[in-house]
């Protein structure tokens, strides 16, 4: 029978308890940097865009099968009454998410090619990516 000694884990935990500090960085003392913040938002925008695509596919299926239904017309009429500001806000943020996700993906392709991997260039490409996402969003919003 194999015997494993886990006493070293207990000793390390006791030492950390004696000096009254957490074993790993806690969220209250951890400062967010642009690199991990942009990575988190890249994942969030990808999820939002995927869910939006699923929602629109579901709506198209409803249109295809239930176009003559009274319930569908009543829902469309109700949504039409409240569609002003809400529709504009949702469409603006979806456009921003599309451009943000596009430029973040291009940034990752540049990294995959082996360029801009120094920390200064990582920060610079992050700021450039943010600026391009907002700029292209505003340009597309003005044009369309």
UniProtKB/Swiss-Prot annotation:
Pathway: Carbohydrate metabolism; tricarboxylic acid cycle. One of its GO terms (molecular function) is metal ion binding. Pfam families: Sdh_cyt (PF01127). Heme binds at residue 101. Its cofactor is heme. It is found in: Mitochondrion inner membrane. The keyword Cytoplasm does not apply. One of its GO terms (biological process) is tricarboxylic acid cycle. One of its GO terms (cellular component) is mitochondrial inner membrane. The heme is bound between the two transmembrane subunits. Its main location: mitochondrion. It is a multi-pass membrane protein. Keywords: Electron transport, Heme, Iron, Membrane, Metal-binding, Mitochondrion, Mitochondrion inner membrane, Transmembrane, Transmembrane helix, Transport, Tricarboxylic acid cycle. Belongs to the cytochrome b560 family. PANTHER family: SUCCINATE DEHYDROGENASE CYTOCHROME B560 SUBUNIT, SUCCINATE DEHYDROGENASE CYTOCHROME B560 SUBUNIT, MITOCHONDRIAL. Membrane-anchoring subunit of succinate dehydrogenase (SDH) that is involved in complex II of the mitochondrial electron transport chain and is responsible for transferring electrons from succinate to ubiquinone (coenzyme Q). Forms part of complex II containing four subunits: a 70 kDa flavoprotein (FP), a 27 kDa iron-sulfur protein (IP), a cytochrome B and a membrane-anchoring protein. This is Succinate dehydrogenase cytochrome b560 subunit. It comes from Reclinomonas americana. The lineage of its organism: Eukaryota, Discoba, Jakobida, Histionina, Histionidae. The gene is SDH3.
């Amino acid at each position: 029978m194999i015997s494993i000694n886990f006493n070293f884990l207990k000793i390390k935990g006791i030492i950390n308890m004696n000096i009254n500090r957490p074993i790993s960085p806690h969220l209250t003392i951890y400062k967010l940097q642009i690199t991990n913040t942009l990575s988190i938002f890249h994942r969030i925008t990808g999820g939002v865009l995927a869910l939006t695509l699923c929602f629109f596919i579901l709506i198209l299926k409803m249109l295809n099968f239930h176009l003559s239904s009274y319930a569908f017309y009543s829902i469309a009429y109700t949504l039409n009454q409240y569609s002003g500001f809400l529709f504009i806000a949702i469409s603006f943020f979806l456009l921003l998410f599309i451009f943000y996700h596009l430029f973040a993906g291009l940034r990752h392709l540049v990294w995959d090619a082996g360029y801009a991997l120094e920390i200064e260039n990582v920060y610079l490409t992050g700021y450039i990516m943010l600026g391009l996402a907002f700029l292209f969003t505003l340009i597309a919003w003005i044009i369309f």
